[in-house]
Amino acid sequence: MQERHTEQDYRALLIADTPIIDVRAPIEFEQGAMPAAINLPLMNNDERAAVGTCYKQQGSDAALALGHKLVAGEIRQQRMDAWRAACLQNPQGILCCARGGQRSHIVQSWLHAAGIDYPLVEGGYKALRQTAIQATIELAQKPIVLIGGCTGSGKTLLVQQQPNGVDLEGLARHRGSAFGRTLQPQLSQASFENLLAAEMLKTDARQNLRLWVLEDESRMIGSNHLPECLRERMTQAAIAVVEDPFEIRLERLNEEYFLRMHHDFTHAYGDEQGWQEYCEYLHHGLSAIKRRLGLQRYNELAARLDAALTTQLTTGSTDGHLAWLVPLLEEYYDPMYRYQLEKKAEKVVFRGEWAEVAEWVKAQ
């Protein structure tokens, strides 16, 4: 039975999106997991806690005996069936536990007895996690070009279209603003960092990468924060600023935040609940910046939002949203971004409309 235990092995697993059957307890998996991992635990949270308590009080032999007692009979058979199905569905996969210790070896031995030889990660999740951290530190040393611009400038799309681009907001499942949440919940911080490392490794492996193209992000993207090694390099990076006409930005924002989000919510929840979720999403975004807008201005814009939603519901038109979106951009988002950009004006190396910036980036 094979084991994978060198750093190059670990990196290869991440680059190949190798399916990982992670046998840690759900609570461990939720705290941090690799991108291609599926959680099929040897022990559930309660069983793991009981074995851990037994280990502290009575030692390893007693804990092991308790584990075998808890995972026996029908419970063991159900989990064996799940592992067997996962192995057959992912013949190129690999087993993983916390440190490559007893849990993955036990599952591996049970599978072997059932006629399935399946490799494991020697060093477990901890080794993969350290590999991800180290890879990010190393890859972040390459030069970086940041794509800047006011809200609605199409920065994310521009990054996505570059072979050396990494969509930080896509990985974080958040668009970085008060209205930035998506229908997918954000990952834990460790899982986000692991996903970022895997994406950087894959992007680097596909080409002779000379520089990264990233969006000009703040430290936080929703509830996730950028790894310090990458954030530090981004503060030193050159910036190309997209300066598109205001009307084009409004068209993008209408498509992204009104048409697409309404579609996504109704697709996920159905027409009635989807509409309620969509309304709540927009109100929550506006409410998040209430203090910065001031109560009077917030109330005015919230009333315009309500009117726009009524119009959208009755006619299907999203034009009414301009009544609150335009002042929100002119009075809040645009001044805020320009202030932030002024503080790093010496880093700006190019300005132009979207297509001009895209052409400039390709030439770098």
Swiss-Prot record:
Active-site annotation: 97 (s-selanylcysteine intermediate)
GO terms, molecular function: transferase activity, transferring alkyl or aryl (other than methyl) groups; tRNA 2-selenouridine synthase activity
Domain Rhodanese: 14-137
Coiled-coil parts of chain: none
InterPro entries listed in its UniProt record: Rhodanese-like_dom, Rhodanese-like_dom_sf, SelU
Enzyme Commission number: 2.9.1.3
The entry's keywords: Selenium, Transferase
NCBIfam families attached to this UniProt entry: PRK11784.1-1, PRK11784.1-3, tRNA_sel_U_synt
Assembly information from the UniProt record: Monomer.
Protein name: tRNA 2-selenouridine synthase
